[in-house]
């Protein structure tokens, strides 16, 4: 399948939000899933997976990506301009809201925020009787991707609690500090009837899972997706 780049914008240091128009495909995916972009680069066909950051609907989908200057794929992606086409496959993935939907804690670092943005935009309105808490951790304030969108969702939906945290905060920062693991345990308190969704770098996800196991959370309530 093919998609045409419609527009893009910078959302962080070396991080870009891309909006594509699919050609001959309706964006039929479940929030939380990902697409695989493919491109022939030199003698190799390179494939990279990116979580869909937009809700389903129409023939458009959005992705966010970091530029890795010495990488093989991201420099090509960042060279795309509106009107350029790219091949993709999918959607794939089982990192989606479980049924029946329970109160949920979502834990993200970096571009791990992508599937949660899709889930929240698409599902908050459908589940007003369920509480959703998002704990989003980055080093610097500028790394809080989609911060404005998430603040608006927290304002518009009483059942959504947005908790950003910085590990290297400026003196002017008045919000939470430290790693997401501690804030997740704080949000969970003594409850064990909550689903915990975790997305981010492998080290964080593995550590978060270990801590949840230590406090006795049923492994079936731990839903995770990790990347290197």
Question: What are the functions of these language-model segments?
Answer:
Residues 113-125:
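Histidine-anchored nucleotide/phosphate-binding helix
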Residues 32, 112, 201:
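Short, conserved phosphate/pyrophosphate- and ester-handling motifs at nucleotide-, phospho-/glycolipid
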Residues 131, 135, 140-228:
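Reductase modules of NAD(P)H-dependent flavoproteins
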Residues 49-61, 98-110, 215:
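Short, compositionally biased
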Residues 125-131:
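Phosphate-handling active-site elements
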Residues 89-100:
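A short, basic/flexible loop-to-alpha-helix module at the beginning of a structural domain
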Residues 1-82, 139:
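Ferredoxin-reductase
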């Amino acid at each position: 399948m093919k998609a045409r780049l419609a527009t893009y914008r910078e959302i962080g240091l070396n991080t870009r939000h891309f909006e594509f128009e699919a050609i001959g495909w309706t964006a039929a995916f479940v929030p939380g899933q990902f697409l695989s972009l493919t491109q022939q680069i030199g003698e190799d066909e390179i494939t990279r997976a990116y979580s869909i950051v937009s809700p389903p609907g129409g023939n458009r989908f959005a992705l966010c990506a970091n530029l890795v200057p010495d990488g093989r794929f991201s420099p090509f992606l960042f060279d795309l301009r509106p009107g350029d086409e790219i091949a993709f496959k999918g959607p794939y993935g089982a990192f989606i809201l479980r049924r029946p939907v329970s109160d949920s804690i979502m834990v993200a670092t970096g571009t791990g925020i992508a599937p949660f943005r899709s889930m929240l935009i698409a599902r908050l309105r459908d589940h007003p009787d369920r509480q959703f808490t998002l704990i989003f951790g980055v080093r610097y304030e500028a790394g809080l991707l989609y911060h404005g969108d998430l603040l608006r969702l927290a304002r518009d939906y009483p059942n959504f609690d947005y908790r950003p945290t910085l590990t290297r905060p400026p003196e002017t920062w008045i919000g939470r500090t430290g790693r997401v693991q501690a804030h997740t345990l704080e949000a969970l308190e003594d409850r064990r009837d909550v689903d915990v969704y975790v997305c981010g770098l492998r080290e964080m996800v593995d550590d978060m899972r270990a801590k949840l196991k230590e406090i006795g959370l049923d492994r079936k309530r731990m839903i995770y997706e990790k990347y290197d």
